[in-house]
Amino acid sequence: MQLFQDLINRAKQFNQAPTCPEQLHAQQGRYKIIHQALKIPNLPAPLHYLNFYSLIGQPRAPIFEQSHLNITQALDVATVLVSTSMHSVGHFHAYDIQQQFEYQDSLFNFDGREILSAHLPHVRFTRNDDELSLDLNIKTLDSGRCFYQLPWSLGQFWSLSCQCLGQLHYAGQTYPIEQRGVLEYARSINFAYLPF
C-alpha cells in the first residue's frame, strides 16, 4: 500500500538528486525532449524581464507542430523563444535539428543565432539578431536550487538560481544587465501516446 501512496504523493521526490545536473546535454539515450530556460525578472524599464526558452525535440502535441519546416518527426524540431517586454518581431524561431542545430561538448548552437555554452556552474548565452541581441555570462548559485523527478525517471527538472551579467542590444540601444535569474533544465522521454 505504501508504494501507491508514494506514487500519488510526489512531494517526497522534490530535491532528491544531485544539487545540479553534471552536464547539460541534447537528446541522449531515452531522453528525447530537452528543455532549457533562462528567466531574468525585475529588469529596469523598458526591458522589465528577459525570457529564453528552448525545446529540443517536440512532444507530439498540435501546439508544437511546425509544419513549415517539412519535418516528419516531431523529435527533429527545436524551438526557441527569446523575449522582453519590448515589442519584438523575431522572438520565436523553429529549427530543423538535423540541419540547423549543433550540439558539441555542452555547446548548444541554434543556427548561429542563439548559442548556449554550459560548463556548470558557468554558462554563457549569446544571441545574434538584427532586432534583439545579447551576451550574458551566467553563474549558478548554491542557494535556490530545486529538483523534481517524475516516477520511474520518465523526466527530470532542475531549477537553479543564478547571477547574470552582460548586455542586451535592442533597436540601437544597449542595456547593461546585472541581475539574478533562474536557469532551468529539464529532460523527458518521448510520450508517444499523446494524440496528434
What does each model-identified segment do?
Residues 1-196:
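Structured soluble/peripheral alpha/beta segments that form catalytic or ligand/cofactor-binding pockets
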